[in-house]
A protein has these predicted regions:
Chain B
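Glycine-rich phosphate-binding loops of nucleotide-dependent enzymes
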Residues: 1-240
Length: 315, 240
């Protein structure tokens, strides 16, 4: 047991150190990519909390990402609040939207849950388009450089941006690890493993699931708000169904229910498309074939497969 | 005081009355056995008592409180524990973690939890496999693990649904010893097919047939009652 804990510390600490160190060796193009990947991986971790650890498959997480993005964006651009406060408003917006959608969607299960979350996300997307005067609809709006100052640091500067992305990723990653080791996290896993039993051990399963949705939504919103601040753009495409499917793909590829899976999944997918689009215009075909292959030969995702074959101790 | 009082319980499944006007009262510290032929409504009845199924009619009081409309998780939190007829554990988690999930709800911190878990595992003699995955346990040990999960919550009423089903003879003997240990401070409602076990551990036996209480009495009374024997054991087994 103790040795497993050491291995975990070593592996996850090593990953964080490697991410930190990468910025000194990467060329500018990849430097920007990795910053983006870390923010998207935060989004994927939020998704994984619900999908991987509670076994709730949502098809509407874009609405949470967008809640963070627009919560921050509107606060910073229209209401003139500072970037740190805007970030908090974004997270809060995601949590509130998560609480409302969770309370309603959790009345359903399985396929119905997927459809209900998908519908809510579409409703969110249409709301953004409807209030085009504020949101600028499809076009979106740019967050001015003056609004992107975070305690004096200019988030449009690539190095500060990398640090910011790294910090957000670290905080989210360590929070997830801590959560999994807390009684709350262990109860979530118990619910995933055998919900009926968890009920008959006296747990209010609905309450736990709702809290999980709220955490998941808040983390997704954190990623959304951070994305807007770091890359300076807020647009309706981030609320579209595509951005609900992405986290599902990332997590499936990386390994649902593993702590590192989301990061691995985003990295893999990002560079798969990046590299294959450099070689051929039919890059989506390459991506598709690889995805099919992975689902066939590593149905538990990359980290899930590694856990199954080599490292049983992976969280 | 009675731990559990059920009055006029009815559960209707479309045309079938699985439980038909059952009244039941279990005083504190009693071991009550519930027996009856297959399809008599035993599991449905404990489903109503534990809240897994809703009553079509009737009223249930637990520790003096009306719990007829209380959801199952709250009944458990009030001091019921329930073990499933079909083993229901967390297979991919360790034996220790299985019991810890049950215990944690009532413990202040992980240290307390570990102590409670260790104690519960010791009582069912599973301490030596604490770090094994629950899925790797033998069937008999999985049944014991279920009981340990119940015990770790220090319930006021422990409902055991066919705990000896599928156990080897030696394991059944161990189980009987365990019930004698549990009864010191816990009321037990036991659904049981094995008449030897019932005769050895039950204070009072309730016999269900076609969803109704056919007979209630001590194990000796049950054995002597010809009607019960006809219903439960079949005519051929009736001894003079």
């Amino acid at each position: 047991m103790r040795r497993d804990v050491q291995k975990n510390l070593l592996l996850h600490g090593g990953v964080l150190v490697a991410l930190f160190a990468l910025q000194f060796v990467l060329p500018a193009y990849h430097h920007g990519n990795v910053a983006r990947i870390m923010v998207l991986a935060t989004y994927a971790m939020g998704y994984n909390l619900l999908f991987g650890y509670v076994d709730l498959l949502s098809l509407g997480h874009a609405v949470f990402f967008a809640a963070g993005l627009y919560g921050m964006g509107i606060a910073v651009s229209h209401l003139g609040v500072s970037a740190p406060l805007g970030l908090m408003i974004g997270v809060l917006a995601g949590g509130v939207v998560g609480a409302i959608i969770g309370a309603l969607a959790l009345r359903t299960e399985g396929v119905a849950f997927m459809i209900v979350t998908l519908m809510f996300a579409q409703a969110g997307y249409l709301i953004i388009l409807y209030f085009g005067e504020i949101t600028r609809g499809d076009e979106g709006f740019v967050i001015q450089q003056v609004d992107r100052l975070f305690f004096g640091g200019d988030l449009s500067d690539p190095f500060i941006r990398y640090y910011a992305a790294f910090t957000v990723f670290c905080i989210s990653f360590l929070s997830i690890l801590a959560l999994l080791h807390s009684p709350f996290g262990k109860t979530l896993i118990a619910i995933r493993e055998n919900q009926e039993r968890a009920v008959m051990l006296g747990y209010n399963v609905m309450r736990f699931k709702l809290l999980a949705v709220i955490f998941s939504a808040a983390l997704s919103a954190l990623a959304g708000a951070t994305y807007g601040l770091l890359f300076g753009y807020v647009g309706a495409s981030f609320a579209s169904v595509q951005y609900s499917i992405f986290p599902l793909l990332w997590v499936l590829l990386g390994g649902a229910g593993t702590a590192l899976g989301p990061l691995v999944g985003v990295f893999f997918m990002f560079y798969l498309i990046d590299i294959s689009s450099g070689m051929t215009t039919a890059y989506m075909l390459v991506a598709g074939v690889v995805l099919v292959g992975l689902t066939l030969f590593a149905p538990q995702g990359l980290m899930g497969e590694i856990r199954r074959r080599f490292w049983r101790w992976l969280p | 005081m009675s731990v559990l009082v059920a009055k006029g319980l009815i559960r209707q499944f479309n045309g079938l009355r699985a439980v038909d006007n059952v009244t039941l009262e279990i005083p504190e510290q009693q071991v009550r056995a519930l027996i009856g032929p297959n399809g008599a409504g035993k599991t449905t009845l404990v489903g109503l008592l534990s809240g897994r199924l809703a009553c079509s009619n009737g009223r249930i009081d637990f520790l003096g409180r009306d719990i007829t409309k209380v959801p199952p998780h709250k009944r458990i939190a009030m001091g019921m524990a329930y073990t499933f007829q079909i083993t229901s554990i967390f297979p991919s988690l360790s034996v220790h973690e299985n019991v810890a999930i049950a215990a944690r709800r009532l413990c202040r911190n992980e240290k307390d939890t570990r102590a409670v878990v260790a104690d519960a595992l010791k009582r069912v003699s599973l301490a030596h496999v604490a770090n094994t995955d629950a899925a790797d346990l033998s069937y008999g040990h999985q049944r014991l693990l279920e009981i340990a999960m119940g015990l770790s919550q220090s319930p006021r009423l422990l409902i055991l649904d066919e705990p000896t089903q599928g156990l080897a003879e030696g394991e059944v003997a161990e189980f009987i010893k365990l019930i004698h240990d549990i009864r010191q401070n816990t009321t037990v409602l036991l659904i049981e097919h094995n008449m030897d076990v019932v005769m050895q551990v039950a204070d009072v036996v309730t016999v269900l047939n076609h969803g109704q209480v056919l007979f209630e009495g001590t194990p000796a009374d049950v054995q002597a009652n010809i009607e019960v024997q006809t219903a439960y054991l079949g005519g051929a087994h009736v001894k003079a």
